[in-house]
């Protein structure tokens, strides 16, 4: 219970104590002092002082190991304080390095600060002369009309009351206005515990402040100082060394306590800690008073208070009191204050990832464990936002997947982590940076794939279109009967030779040069040329047509067509009747082209020499086949319409047949009704390669089979100028009347030499024969009977005269040579084969010179005539739209068939 009352009294005393006293605190150098060692070679200490304190006094760091002597430490100015924060805004950091070769777990280092010069003061105190009476309390003021009464009380019942009596005390009253200072305040003395302030003391309409204190009366045997004022007061002393403690005062309370106080400048007190040291007698040992309390005195000084106990005032009546800097120490153990050197950091790349590797300074004690802290961040981030990893006793770390095309920074630090050894983190290593490789993001790859896919699709589309166009152009360049412009009368249905009654009875089946038979040609059926097809080619001997057949077929198979025919014939004497004839090609004129039958795909139109037959008999022509075209015996033949040549009835029947010719490929008109074909003997006197074959022409019957013709081209045709020949046309001799010569090969019509033939602007199924000099017979368009041949007719048994290969106007028939599915004009030797072109303007006009005349080139003797390309030849054909044979001479009628 007594203890509780005592604690309550102390609490109330603390609350009622108006003075603000702070306990003794550490100075700023001691507060900021931090020391760490590497436990190998040195100790590093960091502390700070204030700029204001350095202007008055400098302090030095002192080190003491265990109980050894004090050793000053040299320190340098530093830029920062990484280990602690300075409580003052104007701190001056310092860094000290203390070499040390020995570190023991039991060693303890003591650090303190000492001023650069001696600082202190001394005082001798006599108790009777240093008496301070108690201060007044219960100060009250009351109003009495225009006066004010100030009252207070003093407690004299204490143990020292026998020293003091009311007669030894007096009271000093000080009052002032609120805005005035206490130095300017008025003073009133009173020997009682009250004082009266009247109007003469106070100013109207002002606020005053008063305070009272107790002091010894002048007649008292005691001396000392008055008690404290109710409120505290501050004043300045004379100037001097501002770093020295000032106004040291000690007062004995007359019982057992000697209270001492002193003042120190605030700037000095922040750096140097002063303590109160006293001696009860001069021979006694010096002791330090504690605790020391501080009190603020305005903005310049700080007052320190300390109470010295006086156990026996009678025995020890004189105390020696001094104020001097205290030696404050701080305990720092080396084994728990280790800071290692910063590691050295390197960045390495391992394939697609990155790794951090570091090395630390080797310590003397290898059993101490290490803990590493690694930080890495992007270049745009700060270290506070970085990623931190902590590893134990490791010297490398593999980084996770990093962002591409990004700069990264990394750093590392280390600290000890073994039991009994502790410290702080080392300084951060030097930050290392590196740039990651660039990688295309997924959305870019997706866009690239999309664009590539679109580009490939577009490329395939355009390539397909371009390839289709190239294919179309290539197909257009390929010769095709459907594209020919040789004839302009549309399609025509012609009757194959097999439908002719003259050859259907008493004749063996059609047999080709290879022994193949075509029984399908025995029937009679119409042929429509809707689609251009290659006409079949049958290699036949013209003599088989003109002579009666006898004996078996001994014609050998012809070899394949050579790619090029010699341009000149081989002249020779006429052969006997039993000599094997030259094998020739038989063609069907069943459309706007001359083509061979399908008996062979690549025939040799000139064939191979036929072995002699027994008894001189020859094979009869196959039924329904006309091997070559027989022309009149000479002279110029006028253009005869097909309908007129075949008769009105036949023409009507032909017109009723459906036209299947391709656009741009007109064919000859055909008359209806069968008629005996006009056949002529083959031309003799030529070798196998230069012997022309006859062109078969027949009037179709509804039952005759027809085959589409092939292209006409020539790789070996040689053109020579023929200025004297007039424009002629090849006219089919179809449907000749019965009053013509019964011979299988009609003769050539003769005429006067030099008579030019008429030039026709349009042709509707005509074949014009070459003119004979001096004659130019014509047949009116309305005359259905063609002109009669005037020249003698060759019999099948007669041998024609040889054709001179050097004749300027050789005579012969236009034959075709099949290569694959196309027909070409074979070479006719050195003789000219003139193709004349129609004039570009419609209507009759002068003839256009042949190609050799268009290109006037002088040819030296013995030099081969240059060959005209096939395309140029067919361009000439397309300009004229009909084939022109060279003129025949009258004196060589036997060379017609």
Swiss-Prot record:
GO terms for cellular component: external side of plasma membrane; granulocyte macrophage colony-stimulating factor receptor complex; plasma membrane. Keywords: Disulfide bond, Glycoprotein, Membrane, Phosphoprotein, Receptor, Repeat, Signal, Transmembrane, Transmembrane helix. Residues 498-517, 532-630, 648-812, 830-849 are annotated as: Disordered. Residues 723-752, 830-840 have a biased composition (Low complexity). It comes from Homo sapiens (Human). This is Cytokine receptor common subunit beta. Its main location: membrane. The gene is CSF2RB. It is found in: Membrane. Glycans are attached at residues 58, 191, 346. A motif (WSXWS motif) lies at residues 425-429. It is a single-pass type I membrane protein. Cell surface receptor that plays a role in immune response and controls the production and differentiation of hematopoietic progenitor cells into lineage-restricted cells. Acts by forming an heterodimeric receptor through interaction with different partners such as IL3RA, IL5RA or CSF2RA. In turn, participates in various signaling pathways including interleukin-3, interleukin-5 and granulocyte-macrophage colony-stimulating factor/CSF2 pathways.
